[in-house]
């Protein structure tokens, strides 16, 4: 790996020598500040290394401040959508790629060095954005355009963009007093840094946990391939003749669904549900701090609580609307849940031939599988044999995208990636016009945060005739097959892949001249 930061695999090249003139400054071959010659202008992950990230972010901040200074010099009487809102919407464009690359590596690769850079970046960019959002002169210009919107002859997309920009300043604290603005800066900084640490603690605690099993009989019920994986886990950690069970790569789900030893299931369940409750990854105080800081910020901005603040710009709009939707469902859902639990417990009592048996949380997955087999004659685990990853992707996900939207996705092997796991695909519409690139990183790996998500390295943008196409990423944590074995998915993993690809479609199909309302 590149010296001083485990961002990319050891085979990566250092950036090329030479000087490049950008924004009036000289840079020694920083690939995050130079136009990429890769297809679609994709980031040169084969050249990016530690020393590139913060200089690129710092230069992006300098360019952002310079652009803001030009806007700030305008007279409110001369403020228009084109000379205020459009440049504000695009002022941080030079920050987009380095920040996205850092975020991608933080989520998908991890490591202490990445977190340190993320914390430094979050503080610098947060300060830069706060300085603009809380700038009275800038807000005066935005408000001048907003107040004259009805007479400006703006189309619906421009009005929506203007409205979002104006609301973002209100929600960011533009109307606060000078003293409140200083406190808001502190709150924003603390929330950002604590959230990064909170998320990293969960990732580290999840990936570092291991339960060593010395008696093979405790693994009864597990498939042979699962036992072999546990043995390989232990061998990699220098232990022979034992089995190492973790929380990643399907270990936890396999034990909870298949292990007949109830105490093993209990131990693993209790360890999983008590992550970050003590020790060096203790998140309890961090969680309290984040909740209280968010509440203070929301109330300073005029909201009753954080829920009211965050829902205002979402579909529901208010906590009351959420309650109106959820509360009528509560009784019906709770009743159905109690009935299903009673059925499952009755089945477990019969299965165990023990009238005193009481269902516990670590029993649910195990007996649910047994009940499903008894009722329907099948096991979900066996479906995996028919769900080959390549087939699900090409004959499932991509096939549906083509049938519904006429989109085709073709694998590209000439796009730089940061890890061999990452696959890249070129998306085109029904007429063969390019839509962008998809980066697919589906399998569990040390350092990658848990869950599944869709993000982007670059959003769609256009300025006149110049069009920049999106670079969309999908990241998952599917169970990794043993070397030489086929990559098979569970039914849950198949649903996850379809779900995340739905987000990717939004990234490919969203078009418009203003970043505020595209992507």
Regions found by a protein language model. Give the residues of each.
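Short His/Asp/Glu-rich catalytic/ion-coordination signatures at enzyme active sites or charged loops
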Residues: 37-52, 102-121, 144-186, 246-285, ...
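Active-site-proximal, well-structured secondary-structure segments within enzyme catalytic domains
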Residues: 157, 161, 193, 200, ...
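Active-site recognition of the HExxH zinc-binding catalytic motif
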Residues: 492-507
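Bacterial N-terminal signal peptides
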Residues: 11-25
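N-terminal helix-rich structural modules
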Residues: 29-225, 229
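Acidic/histidine-rich catalytic neighborhood
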Residues: 434, 510-519
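Bacterial N-terminal signal peptides that target proteins for export
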Residues: 2-13
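Active-site rim elements
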Residues: 382-389, 482-490, 518
């Amino acid at each position: 790996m590149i010296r001083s930061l485990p961002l990319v695999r050891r085979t990566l090249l250092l950036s090329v020598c030479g000087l490049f003139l950008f924004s009036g400054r000289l840079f020694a071959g920083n690939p995050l500040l130079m136009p990429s010659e890769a297809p679609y202008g994709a980031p040169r992950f084969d050249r990016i290394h530690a020393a590139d990230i913060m200089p690129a972010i710092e230069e992006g901040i300098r360019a952002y401040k310079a652009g803001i200074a030009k806007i700030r010099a305008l007279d409110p009487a001369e403020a228009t959508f084109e000379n205020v809102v459009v440049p504000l919407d695009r002022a941080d464009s030079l920050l987009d790629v380095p920040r996205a690359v850092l975020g991608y590596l933080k989520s998908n690769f991890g490591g202490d060095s990445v977190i340190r850079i993320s914390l430094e970046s979050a503080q610098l960019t947060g300060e830069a954005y706060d300085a603009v959002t809380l700038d009275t002169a800038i807000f005066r210009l935005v408000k001048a355009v907003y107040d004259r919107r009805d007479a400006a002859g703006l189309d619906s997309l421009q009005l929506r963009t203007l409205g979002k920009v104006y609301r973002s300043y209100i929600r960011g604290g533009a109307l606060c007093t000078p003293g409140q603005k200083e406190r808001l800066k502190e709150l924003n900084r603390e929330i950002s840094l604590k959230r990064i640490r909170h998320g990293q603690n969960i990732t580290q605690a999840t990936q570092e946990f291991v339960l060593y099993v010395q008696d093979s009989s405790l693994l009864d019920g597990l498939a042979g391939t699962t036992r072999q994986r546990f043995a390989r886990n232990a061998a990699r950690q220098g232990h022979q003749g034992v089995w190492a069970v973790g929380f990643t790569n399907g270990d936890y789900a396999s034990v909870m669904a298949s292990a007949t030893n109830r105490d093993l299931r209990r131990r693993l369940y209790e360890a999983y549900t008590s992550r970050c409750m003590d020790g060096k990854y203790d998140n309890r105080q961090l969680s309290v701090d984040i909740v209280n800081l968010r509440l203070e910020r929301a109330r300073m901005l005029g909201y009753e609580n954080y829920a009211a603040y965050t829902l205002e710009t979402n579909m529901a709009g208010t906590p009351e609307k959420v309650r109106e939707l959820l509360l009528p469902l509560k009784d019906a859902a709770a009743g159905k849940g109690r009935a299903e639990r009673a059925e499952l417990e009755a089945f477990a009592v019969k299965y165990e031939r023990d009238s005193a048996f009481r269902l516990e949380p670590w029993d649910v997955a195990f007996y649910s599988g047994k009940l499903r087999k008894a009722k329907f004659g099948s096991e979900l685990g066996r479906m995996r044999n028919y769900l080959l990853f390549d087939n699900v992707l090409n004959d499932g996900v991509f096939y549906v995208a083509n049938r519904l939207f006429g989109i085709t996705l073709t694998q590209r092997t000439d796009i730089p990636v940061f890890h061999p796991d990452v696959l890249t695909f070129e998306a085109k519409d029904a007429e063969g016009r390019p839509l962008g690139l998809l980066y697919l990183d589906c399998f569990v790996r040390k350092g990658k945060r848990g869950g599944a998500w869709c993000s982007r390295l670059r959003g769609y943008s256009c300025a006149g005739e110049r069009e920049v196409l999106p670079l969309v990423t999908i990241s998952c944590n599917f169970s990794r097959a043993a070397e030489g074995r086929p990559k098979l998915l569970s039914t849950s993993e198949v649903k996850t892949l379809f779900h995340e690809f739905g987000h990717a479609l939004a990234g490919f199909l969203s078009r418009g001249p203003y970043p505020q309302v595209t992507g």
